[in-house]
Every structure is written in C-alpha cells, then in structure tokens.
Amino acid sequence: MSRQSKMPFPSPQPETEPTLGFTIWISLRRGISPQAEQVFERSLADYMDSRDLQWWGTHLCAAVSGDDRDLTETDQVDLLLWLVEGVTPTTVEIGPLGPGTGLPARRDSVPVVRAQSSDLMLIPMIWLYRAARVDARQVLQMLGGFSTISTVH
C-alpha cells in the first residue's frame, strides 16, 4: 500500500473563527474494487492521524474534529483538496456538524461546499492555494461557499 505524500499546504493569512468540527461526505468512483476502497480508507485514516484529526463515522460520511483544538477553514480546505486530488473519490462535500449533536449532519439538511474531481477549475485553484495566492476562505468561496443544500438521490 503506497502512501500519498503531499506538500504541506500554506496558511497565508490569519485564520477566521475556528469551529468545533465539520461533516464530510465522500462519493467514490463507480466500480471501485473492495481492495481499492480499503486502500482509500487506510490512506484517509493516515491523513487524519498525521494532522491530529479525529473522525467518527465511516470513510464515506464522518464528523471531523481536532484532537485538542478547534478546526479552521484551512483544515477543511486541506482535507477537501487532498481528497479530490486522489483517484478514488469523485465528489466531496463539507458541511457543519449536526445542530447541537457534534455528530455528522444529515446530508440534505445543511448547506455544503461541493468539489468534484472532474472539475477542471480545481487544478488552478489548488496551484493558487499552494502558492499562497489565495487562502482557504477564498477557495471555499470559489467553490460556491456554504450555500447549496445537497440533494440525495
């Protein structure tokens, strides 16, 4: 099993108000083998461990929080971009935790930011973010902000 090594993401500007955590939903590529899904799950666990992030749920829907800290927009964007750069996920959505629960929110009940690996605009966005030309908040805004309520089919 190979581990993806990525350059650390810069944090060019002061962070905005931290949050306790967020919910993440991941849609995998169709026809993925069980072995490839296990490799993805392990890679995700390694990513979370390397950044002192805790997650409750599955590798497809989880609540993410900091080990001993609140999370910021940079934490959200770093994870989102790491996921869409991979081969396995096709769509990644990030939203708030369930109101008052600290658990993953229902996908159709909260506003989300959505990124799809097939979106060619992500490539320059990732480059600009890594070059510290845009910050995490700007990336979230370019992706549409937390304005869309996901429709589950």
Annotate each language-model stretch with its function.
Residues 1-153:
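Long, contiguous binding/interaction regions
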